[in-house]
Structure formats: C-alpha cells, structure tokens
C-alpha cells in the first residue's frame, strides 16, 4: 500500500487537485449507492477535488441469462488474453456497464475531458504533484490517459526480453498475442511524465476524451470485456491513442485484487 493524501475537505486544496478541477469538464467517482463507508473515506482522500458520485450498476440487480437474452452481454468472441477468468462475474459485468454508461453520457453531453475514479482510489502523495505537468504534456490527439494503474509501471530487463520473445513468435502463431499486440505490451517513452500506454490493469483512475469515450462505448456494446480489459484490448490492438502517467499518480486500497478485476466494482461492489 502506497502513501496517500488524507486532506479533510475543509483544508487547502492540493495544487494537483486544483489543476484537475480546471482541466476536466467532469470528474466522476464510480461507487455503489450502498457503499456508504467508502464514500465517507473519499471525503478525506479527495478533499478539494470537485467530483460527482456516479451510482454503479449493482450485481444484485443483474441476471446473466436475461442480459444475454436481451443482447446486452456477450463475451462469446472475447479472446482468452482479454479475460480475467472463463466468464465475467456479475460484479465485473456491473463494473463494465457502469463505465460504459459514463462513456455514453460523455458523448451525449458533449464533454471534452472526463476523469473517472473508483471509490477505493488513493492519491499517491509522492507523485501527485506531477499531475499538472502530465496533463500539459498530453497531445491534442489523446483519447485515453491512465492516471493510476497496476502492472507495467516499472519494466525489468526480463520483461522486455519476454516481450521480444512474444513479438518474435507471434507471426508463427505460437503466442497468445498477435504480432501488433505483442509490440504494444509494454509502455513506450513519450514525454517527461507520460508514456505511450501498454498493457495495464485497473480502472481506478483515468481520463478519457470524447472521441475516446465514443470508441470505448462502441467496443463495449454489447458488454464483452471487464472494464479494464476493454482498455487493454483497445490499446494493444491500436484502436485508441492512449497514454499513462509515469510515475502513476493514484493507487487503490487493495492492489492484490487488481489482477482479477477492478477492486471497487469488481470485488466488493460486484464479485460473485
């Protein structure tokens, strides 16, 4: 667990939050309506940030068979590399629906820049001051930017060697990754505080442009991917122009749950 800012709402707003308030058209925190304790913790962690709570789709209100019958959910063509498990849990489906609804709302409302957080997000005190610089470095054509993520923040030589191996054998059909995907697995340098995004997990903190939201909503209709796997698929297949803040600016309460799916909506808010 990383360091965190715990600033009561009445205290001075951190400069990074002031910058984010000015930059984003909307800042949403995805959270179950019944997650009252998490919502209360946000008041201290995000003091000064002008965010709106977005009621997540609750797994208790979902029926897998009905969703499939209605054409709202279909992961029959989702490849194994973009699955956390054989079939998405109801919680993961609820998480995916929640994020997709935000994308749809963004497009319909005409917002240019939206920040999406989840209710277990933790600002990383040591790096958060770099947020204004990272935002300034985004090119006009950006569509997605991770502000926080799990996996591939620091790249070991062994991991780079593994990527080269995947890239070499992918054309032979010997890898789970296709050639273009293998080349995009690891983040690449871009600017002092940004990298071109690679394969990252979690959706606890990211920004999206209107065009990025339009693309993500279309790719997730019907729901076929966990929320974070949707972003991964779009990035590795070159469908979206994505960046990642480096170092990451936000963490989660429980990073150990990240490999399964987004900790907030995919486990406590939704896991089966």
Language-model-detected regions and their locations in the chain:
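An acidic/histidine-cluster motif and surrounding catalytic segment
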Residues: 2-117, 121-272
């Amino acid at each position: 667990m990383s360091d965190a800012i715990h600033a009561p709402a009445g205290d001075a707003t951190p400069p990074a939050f002031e910058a984010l308030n000015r930059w984003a058209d909307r800042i949403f925190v995805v959270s179950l309506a019944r997650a009252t304790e998490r919502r209360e913790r946000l008041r201290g962690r995000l003091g000064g940030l002008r965010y709106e709570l977005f009621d997540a789709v609750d797994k208790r209100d979902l029926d897998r068979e009905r969703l499939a019958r209605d054409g709202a959910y279909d992961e029959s063509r989702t490849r194994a590399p973009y699955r956390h498990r054989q079939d998405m849990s109801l919680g993961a489906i609820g998480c995916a629906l929640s994020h997709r609804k935000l994308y749809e709302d963004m497009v319909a409302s005409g917002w240019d820049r939206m920040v999406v957080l989840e209710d277990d997000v933790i600002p990383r005190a040591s790096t958060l001051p770099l947020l204004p610089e990272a935002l300034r470095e985004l090119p006009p054509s950006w569509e997605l930017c991770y502000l926080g993520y799990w996996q591939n923040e620091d790249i070991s030589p062994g991991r780079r060697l593994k990527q080269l191996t995947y890239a070499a054998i992918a054309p032979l059909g010997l890898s789970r990754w296709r050639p273009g995907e293998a080349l995009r697995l690891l983040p690449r340098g871009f600017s002092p505080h940004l990298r071109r995004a690679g394969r990252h997990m979690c959706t606890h903190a990211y920004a999206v442009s209107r065009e990025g939201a339009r693309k993500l909503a279309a790719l997730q209709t019907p729901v076929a991917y966990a929320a974070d796997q949707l972003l991964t698929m779009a990035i590795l297949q070159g469908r979206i122009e994505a960046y990642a803040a480096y170092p990451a600016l936000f963490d989660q309460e429980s990073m150990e749950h990240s490999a399964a799916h987004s900790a907030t909506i995919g486990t406590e808010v939704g896991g089966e």
